[in-house]
């Protein structure tokens, strides 16, 4: 894990994250113009960072947030499509991989159903290697149709990469799912706004540590007329320590080199903090001392997860018993979100 240079090597993957200023767009033509702006930025960045193997842009960086529902549906993309072809040309020209946001991607039943919030991982030949749809849209505000699966793909120089989006990263389950599938770098693209800056910086570092995984966060900056975005795009080592972090500046870039051999060695030889290994070898020292084998306990001890898989509706009812039974709240109603009406006093 190296920070401060502009290079990379056969062992290290040069990763850049961008504080992209949140655009405010309304038409397909504006979206495509903005995609070309991103493409130009990629080529320029490669000139300044010759070791850059992977460049990552935030959630909403291509489309901005379409606060008008009609505009959101009209500008929803297909994958592949016009936007991805612009990015493909830039990746080929700069000879880099890229992670790009599409908000949204047309649903299979478009326009009857809401679009997806989608990320793509594209290789240096302009080919889409991974397409991920946001599993946890930021309700009640975001109206995206939820995805249902994480993926791991071989990225530049063989580094194993998973994509997640913004609010996904508030749930430890998704980080663990990616890491346990073999991800060595988890990319979190977000369009996160104030007031949650401190929490999001902490979350990314904690999840890197807990999952023995590199984390790259690309976040929006600026003000789009509705929200103020805090930036702080960052690259974090698998030991939970920050390698490089932007401030709030528009178009800020951070860059670091992520070693393949180092993370693989740590996962193979780490002991007291090898969280992935220890989770399925629980208490092996005590079992060895008790004559009960030398590999620890593999079974999951967490009742919630077993119940959730076996009985999702029953688990939902259990959670509603100590939270609430409607998606909305009567004390802070949001238009279109059902809630219990306050009784007449």
Swiss-Prot record:
It catalyses: a monocarboxylic acid amide + H2O = a monocarboxylate + NH4(+). The active site is at residues 59, 134, 166. Transmembrane segments: none annotated. Its EC number is 3.5.1.4. CDD domains: aliphatic_amidase. The keyword Hydrolase applies. GO terms for molecular function: amidase activity. Signal peptide: none annotated. SUPFAM superfamilies: Carbon-nitrogen hydrolase. Keywords: Hydrolase. The keyword Cell cycle does not apply. It comes from the Bacteria. Residues 13-260 form the CN hydrolase domain. PANTHER family: ALIPHATIC AMIDASE, NITRILASE C965.09-RELATED. Catalyzes the hydrolysis of short-chain aliphatic amides to their corresponding organic acids with release of ammonia. NCBIfam families: PRK13286.1. Belongs to the carbon-nitrogen hydrolase superfamily. Aliphatic amidase family. This is Aliphatic amidase. It comes from Bradyrhizobium sp. (strain BTAi1 / ATCC BAA-1182).
